[in-house]
């Protein structure tokens, strides 16, 4: 049995206690994003991916609430075909001062996710939106920056990381950093696809910034000694 002791002095400033989740209605393989998202599997053995996603979604909401996280669920609808709507962090970002970022999306069916009703819902839930910075017009120039999929934000130290790809434009990233007062860190990352090395489509696929809790396991000898009765 493992016994964990958590230091209450740990800074949890990289985490949030309130999140937005979009409950999917058309979740599944997305033809429009598959050309550079090589993690998708068109031949998945899951017969009803949307039903499976909804069940997993509902379980996650319950688990988060049971652990003290405030979850604000917005129900997607069938008016538009949005198979990736469960990932709202790609088109919107929220910031502690009330600023909101809206981002240009690579796939046309993902642009449909960028709905004012979502922000109106959050305001009805008591959130204050003081300023919206909208980068979505860059879609007309085929420039994209898909929110905190493209960028990893170190909110405590005001550093932003971005791995350049079709969905993560360097100029837009620098513009975001200037607008939101982050120091940019730009790099490239790759994955093997067949015999090719191709850019990883989203930075958050390969890195994150979070609070790290480290458990140090005693050596086998120490564990044995702890179970041995003491002798004179």
Predicted regions and their residues:
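Long, hydrophobic/aromatic-enriched structural stretches that serve as scaffold segments
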Residues: 67-110
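Structural signature of eukaryotic scaffold interfaces centered on beta-propeller domains
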Residues: 12-13, 85-94, 145-155, 200-211
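Blade-edge beta-strand/turn elements of extracellular beta-propeller
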Residues: 183-193
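Intrinsically disordered, low-complexity linker/loop segments enriched in Gly/Pro
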Residues: 79, 104-156, 161-171, 175
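Single conserved hydrophobic/aromatic residue that forms the stacking wall/gate
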Residues: 215-232
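N-terminal leader/transition segments
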Residues: 1-75, 97
């Amino acid at each position: 049995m493992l016994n964990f002791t958590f230091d209450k002095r740990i800074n949890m400033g990289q985490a949030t206690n309130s999140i937005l989740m979009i409950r999917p209605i058309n979740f599944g393989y997305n033809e429009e994003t598959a050309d550079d998202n090589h993690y998708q599997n068109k031949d998945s053995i899951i017969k009803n991916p949307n039903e499976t996603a909804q069940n997993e979604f509902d379980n996650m909401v319950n688990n988060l609430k049971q652990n003290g996280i405030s979850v604000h669920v917005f129900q997607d609808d069938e008016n538009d075909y949005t198979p990736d709507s469960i990932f709202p962090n790609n088109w919107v970002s929220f910031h502690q001062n009330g600023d909101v970022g809206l981002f240009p999306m690579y796939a046309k069916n993902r642009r449909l996710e960028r709905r004012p009703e979502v922000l109106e819902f959050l305001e009805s839930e008591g959130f204050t939106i003081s300023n919206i910075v909208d980068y979505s017009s860059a879609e007309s120039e085929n420039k994209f920056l898909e929110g905190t999929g493209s960028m990893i934000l170190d909110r405590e130290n005001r550093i932003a990381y971005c791995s350049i790809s079709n969905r993560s434009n360097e100029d837009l990233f620098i513009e975001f950093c200037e607008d939101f007062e982050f120091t940019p860190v730009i790099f490239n990352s790759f994955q093997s696809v067949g015999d090719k090395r191709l850019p990883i489509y989203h930075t958050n696929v390969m890195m994150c910034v979070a609070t790290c809790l480290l458990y140090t396991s005693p050596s086998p000898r120490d564990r044995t000694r702890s179970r041995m009765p003491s002798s004179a």
